[in-house]
Amino acid sequence: MSLAFALDELVATGWSGLDSTGCSFDVDGRAYPTPARVQQEFAQAGFSVAIQKIDKYNCFRASWREVGQPQDAGAVVSHSEPEAAVYALAQLRRGLVTADV
C-alpha cells in the first residue's frame, strides 16, 4: 500500500481536502489529513484511534474502537504513520456508510 492508495480510498468515501486545516500534501499536491486531524475525525464519529509503530515488523498499526467499548472495531497496517492514519479513516468512513444502510 502507499499513501496515494490510502488517499484514493479515503476520497472514494466522499472525503474532500477542500478544508485543508490539519492536512499535509502528497507529492501530487493532494491534501490528506494528518494523524492529528484523523484523531479529531474519529472522535467526531464517536471512536478513538491509536496508531502504534511496530518495530519488530517496521510498520505502523492503526486500530480503532467505539468510545467506551473494550474491543477494536477495526485495524490496518501500513508502512508509515500518515498512511496508516489515512487508510484507517477511509475504512472507518466506509464502515459507517455500510452501517447506515
At which residue positions do the language-model features occur?
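N-terminal segment of the canonical double-stranded RNA-binding domain
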Residues: 2-71
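Short, compact, well-ordered microdomains
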Residues: 59-98
